[in-house]
UniProtKB/Swiss-Prot annotation:
This is Uncharacterized protein MJ0808.1.
Amino acid sequence: MLKEIKNDYDKIREKMTQKIQELNQQITQIKKQIQIIEQNNLSDQQNQTIQKIKRQIYSIEFDILRVESNRSNMIYSKTFEDMCEYLDSHSGIGRIFAESFMREIEKNIQLMKQLVMMEDQIIKIKQEIRMIEKDLKI
């Protein structure tokens, strides 16, 4: 039982790592687009929009760092897997470890939801950038 829970935990951590990498790549792309846009003669409105987007990006970057530092980071080894087998055969102790894993899984699921919300923010930012690029014919 513990091995299955550990596998679920590992899958969620892997998905979080992938999502964080994706978000960071998108942010890098947005920053490049902003640099190109800023080389143009911007109207006051466009300039305000770019400044707002920059603040949003900084905020998202900070949130990503916060998620990275808050996500559960249990470390495993072969010895740990052997211990899981032993604990599974001693149900009382195994249940305590399983409950602990479940709490960590739930914590990571909540953090993953935050990452998805950040992704939604990035999508909106990309739409705003496209509008400015379209106006500037970039």
